[in-house]
Amino acid sequence: MKWKEGEGISLFLKPSGYTGAVPYGKEPGSNGLLMDPEGRLLSAEHGDRRISILYPDGGKRTLADNYQGKRLNSPNDLTRHSSGAIYFTDPPYGLPNNVNDPRKELDFQGVFRVTPGGAVTLLTREMTRPNGIAFSPDEKTLYVAQSDPEKAIWMAFPVKDDGTLGQGKVLAEVTAMVGKMKGLPDGLKVDRAGNIWATAPG
């Protein structure tokens, strides 16, 4: 869907995130979206298990769909570094049987970086359900939400000069709130002042 001032909401793209190329589908559509400086729409696609690029003229291509020859789980959210690299989370939510799905090829849930040329790097595999992702204004810290009811946290990772991540730390935890209120850590954004706006139980 899209929203335009004076016009409101209208259909933008259908299908979105699932072309039927992969025979399954739980939460099959696109999830995280971002618009890059060139006006291209990048999408984390649960259904087709990839990061895609939609060009202003309507053309579309895959930026990343595997790591070392194994299909990604179901990319969930993404953010752009000023270098042009895309950082994204890859939980199992798009797979019908989640972590136990027979189509799952990776034995972990990762946070990845993909360069404009399509080179994919695993940044961390320590998170069980990585979800929302965003940089601090100076790009020295990467924040990642974890939507695991048994460990509902936000992590903060230092970003090294080469774009990889240092040892992360737990920024906040709301596990005690899970079950008492609806919701989990999910999407997040960081404003220009460095404030983190995040979904949570509530």
Segments from the language model and where they lie:
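Sequence-structural signature of mature extracellular/luminal beta-sheet repeat domains
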Residues: 1-202
